[in-house]
């Protein structure tokens, strides 16, 4: 009886693996596709643009700094695979005025055709203890990280639905999967992206438009270097429990997942564990993905509890050291 049950289980799992590709999205062909990348003048955004360009895409780079845009354009053009490819640069703040963003997208589509893939990579990080952060910092991060993704997505979605094809990528962060000391403003803005993406995916899936939410770890970018300048000790020590990734690695994974239409995009074993742990009611791209989440949930939750204990220990040690230092100063 046990052998029969085991045989049935194995057959069922094999059937899932065979059927899964049949219900998964058809991969997006990048050769000749029009890819718009916001925040594309540096860091992960620039590397994503390069990765897409290597595969034959036409690129529209969107960022605020025109000089950085032109420099990024030169770097990207070095990776062309044919002489027909184009890199278009548009300088605009995607978080300030929706009408301006909409006009910019229209200009890009008039020159390079309908947008096949939008990558929302514009963003910034500011860390600090909750009571030390200015209220304006919370407003600024929500504007840049959240509305800066809403506006471009809203500008392309109608055309994508009409054409019955498209990909929209939201670049969140592992801090958009779990809240960490010092990230009360940043994490909130990145968690918001997850809610937007889940709701939007349910709306556009019948139109063959697929959403990808990327959760990159700490990545060696100019933005990360700037973030480290003001990072609290607790935040820095917690961050140092994992390694820093290269932007090229992150970009390759994001582009791969976006092409496949995967809802989640993560990197490494920690990223895989976090995505499985925090899947909740998020959509799955394949039956096997859902099965893996069900099977691994218990184990990953156990591991996560040890991580949380370690993080809490770091915070307590820092607090004790700070209080000891303050008491020493008072008695000096």
From Swiss-Prot:
Q: Does the keyword Transmembrane helix apply?
A: yes
Mutating residue 154 to W leads to what result?
In EKVP4; uncertain significance
Q: Return the Gene3D superfamilies for the record.
A: NAD(P)-binding Rossmann-like Domain
Q: Which residues of the sequence carry a binding annotation for NADPH?
A: 39, 41-43, 64, 68, 93
| Phenotype when changing residue 190 to R/I | Impairs activity
Gene Ontology molecular function, alphabetical: 3-dehydrosphinganine reductase activity; NADPH binding
- Topology check: give the Lumenal ranges: 292-293
Q: Where is this motif: GXSXG?
A: 39-43
Q: What does this protein do?
A: Catalyzes the reduction of 3'-oxosphinganine (3-ketodihydrosphingosine/KDS) to sphinganine (dihydrosphingosine/DHS), the second step of de novo sphingolipid biosynthesis.
Name it: 3-ketodihydrosphingosine reductase
Organism name: Homo sapiens (Human)
Q: What is the lineage of its organism?
A: Eukaryota, Metazoa, Chordata, Craniata, Vertebrata
Gene label: KDSR
């Amino acid at each position: 009886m046990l052998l029969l049950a085991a045989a049935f289980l194995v057959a069922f799992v094999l059937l899932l693996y065979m059927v899964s590709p049949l219900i998964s999205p058809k991969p997006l062909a990048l050769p000749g596709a029009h890819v718009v990348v916001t925040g594309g003048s540096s860091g992960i955004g620039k590397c994503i643009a390069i990765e897409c360009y290597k595969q034959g895409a036409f690129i529209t780079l969107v960022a605020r700094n025109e000089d950085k845009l032109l420099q990024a354009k030169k770097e990207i053009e070095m990776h062309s695979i044919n002489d027909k490819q184009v890199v278009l640069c548009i300088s605009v703040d995607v978080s300030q005025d929706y009408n301006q963003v909409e006009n910019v997208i229209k200009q890009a589509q008039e020159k390079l055709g309908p947008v096949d893939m939008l990558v929302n990579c514009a963003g910034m990080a500011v860390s600090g203890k909750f009571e030390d952060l200015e209220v304006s910092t919370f407003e600024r991060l929500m504007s840049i990280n959240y509305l800066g993704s809403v506006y471009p997505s809203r500008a392309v979605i109608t055309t994508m639905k009409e054409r019955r094809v498209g990909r929209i990528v939201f670049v969140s962060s592992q801090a958009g999967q779990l809240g960490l000391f010092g990230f009360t403003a940043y994490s909130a803005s990145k968690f918001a992206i997850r809610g937007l993406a889940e709701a939007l995916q349910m709306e556009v899936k019948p139109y063959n438009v697929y959403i990808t939410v990327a959760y990159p770890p700490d990545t060696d970018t100019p933005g990360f270097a700037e973030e480290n300048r003001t990072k609290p000790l607790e935040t820095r020590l917690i961050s140092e429990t994992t390694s820093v990734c290269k932007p090229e690695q992150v970009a390759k994974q994001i582009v791969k997942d976006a092409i496949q239409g995967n809802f989640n995009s993560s990197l490494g074993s920690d990223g895989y564990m976090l995505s499985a742990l925090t899947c909740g009611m998020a959509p799955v791209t394949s039956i096997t993905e859902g099965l893996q989440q069900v099977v691994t949930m218990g184990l990953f939750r156990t591991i996560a509890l040890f991580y949380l204990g370690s993080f809490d220990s770091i915070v307590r040690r820092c607090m004790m050291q700070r209080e000891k230092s303050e008491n020493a100063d008072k008695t000096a």
